């Protein structure tokens, strides 16, 4: 059974060395991409410590140091991880990425989403400005729109009074699920909200995460019908929306999502942001028959972000089959 970096640090008294080692791997362009991702998730574990430890800030700074990488895939994952830490020391790093118009739109979108996940009211002005800037990339504007609504919801009375279903997922989502009511909403009702393009994206996302929570545990009678409803979201005009459907399927790791994920990855007319998310979602299903073989068909895909995602997805598939406890990078033990 593999132990986490944090466990090793506590046992060996060299946690500072662990952060330095992980930072070196994460920021090295010569390190294999899959190894860098494992280093990132190890650092995320340390950066998310509650209460904070002496490794928390160095871990945050180590993650942020990798924003100099040319890999859009890696940088967008850095932003996601910082947003999951619940630590406002990450905010300056995320704002810098979001406001850099030379940065890849996928990375800027993830930085905006992370600021929303952190509930950082101090970032509202930046998010609102970019949301309303018609010259901005659509994916950035849409993400800022959702992030603004999430922060306003989190700081409102509604967030205190709404009764939400306890989720099996520990992630900080772009939107909470729709609240429970006296009459529980059916899958067709949630699907109608999910697919209604006239509604605010925030509300549609709330329906998305309500449907997600109806799929866990995977043997629930609602699981497959809810997945089928979510899969209809792949027809939406918004690339941001489609990529979030793929992300949710990655969280669920339910075999019923495989056909729609394979179709999305295989669609060469689909944007890279969506195809890459489908690839990583399939990586989480790597123990299922045929998935690994499907992923290998795209190792030479012409789109860089898809090729990179296949590398990570295949590593995730190996992890799923290996029985490892954590998807992390362990520091080699000195002889």
Curated annotation (Swiss-Prot):
Reactions the enzyme catalyzes: [eIF5A protein]-deoxyhypusine + AH2 + O2 = [eIF5A protein]-hypusine + A + H2O
Pathway listed: Protein modification; eIF5A hypusination
Any one Gene Ontology cellular component term annotated for this protein: cytoplasm
Ranges for the HEAT-like PBS-type repeats: 74-100, 107-133, 203-233, 241-267, 274-301
Listed GO MF terms: deoxyhypusine monooxygenase activity; metal ion binding
Annotated localization: Cytoplasm; Nucleus
SUPFAM superfamilies noted in UniProt: ARM repeat (SSF48371)
Keywords for the protein's UniProt record, in alphabetical order: Cytoplasm, Hypusine biosynthesis, Iron, Metal-binding, Monooxygenase, Nucleus, Oxidoreductase, Repeat
Cofactor note: Binds 2 Fe(2+) ions per subunit.
Oxidoreductase recorded as keyword: yes
Transmembrane segments: none
Protein residues bound to Fe cation 2: 243-244, 276-277
Known EC number: 1.14.99.29
Binding-site residues for Fe cation 1, renumbered to this chain: 76-77, 109-110
Cofactor(s) listed in the protein's UniProt record: Fe(2+)
Keyword Transmembrane: no
Family to which this protein belongs: Belongs to the deoxyhypusine hydroxylase family.
Biological role: Catalyzes the hydroxylation of the N(6)-(4-aminobutyl)-L-lysine intermediate to form hypusine, an essential post-translational modification only found in mature eIF-5A factor.
Protein name: Deoxyhypusine hydroxylase
Organism, as annotated: Coccidioides immitis (strain RS)
The organism's taxonomic lineage, starting at the top: Eukaryota, Fungi, Dikarya, Ascomycota, Pezizomycotina
Name of encoding gene: LIA1
């Amino acid at each position: 059974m593999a132990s986490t970096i944090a466990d090793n640090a506590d046992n060996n008294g060299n946690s500072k060395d662990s952060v330095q080692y992980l930072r070196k791997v994460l920021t090295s362009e010569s390190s294999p991409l899959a190894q860098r991702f494992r280093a990132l998730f190890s650092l995320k574990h340390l950066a998310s410590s509650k209460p904070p430890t002496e490794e928390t800030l160095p871990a945050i700074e180590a993650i942020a140091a990798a924003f100099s990488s040319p890999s859009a895939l890696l940088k967008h994952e850095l932003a996601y991880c910082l947003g999951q830490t619940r630590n406002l020391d990450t905010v300056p790093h995320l704002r810098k990425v979001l406001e850099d118009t030379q940065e890849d739109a996928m990375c800027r979108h993830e930085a905006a989403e992370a600021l929303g996940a952190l509930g950082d009211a101090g970032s509202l002005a930046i998010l609102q400005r970019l949301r309303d800037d018609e010259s901005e990339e659509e994916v950035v504007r849409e993400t800022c729109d959702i992030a603004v609504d999430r922060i306003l919801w989190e700081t409102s009375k509604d967030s205190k009074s709404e009764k939400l279903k306890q989720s099996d997922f520990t992630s900080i989502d772009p939107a909470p699920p729709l609240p429970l009511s006296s009459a529980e909403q059916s899958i067709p009702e949630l699907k109608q909200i999910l697919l209604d393009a006239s509604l605010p994206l925030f509300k549609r996302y709330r329906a998305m995460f309500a449907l997600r929570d109806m799929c866990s545990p995977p043997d629930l009678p609602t699981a497959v019908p809810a997945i089928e409803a979510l899969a209809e979201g792949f027809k939406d005009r918004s690339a941001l929306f489609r990529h979030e459907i793929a992300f949710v399927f990655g969280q669920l790791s339910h075999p019923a999502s495989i056909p729609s994920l394979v179709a999305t990855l295989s669609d060469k007319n689909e944007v890279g942001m969506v195809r890459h998310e489908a690839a990583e979602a399939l990586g989480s299903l790597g123990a299922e028959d045929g998935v690994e073989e499907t992923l290998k068909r795209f190792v030479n895909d012409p789109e860089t972000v898809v090729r990179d995602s296949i590398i990570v997805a295949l590593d995730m598939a190996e992890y799923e089959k290996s029985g490892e406890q954590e998807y992390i990078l362990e520091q080699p033990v000195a002889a």
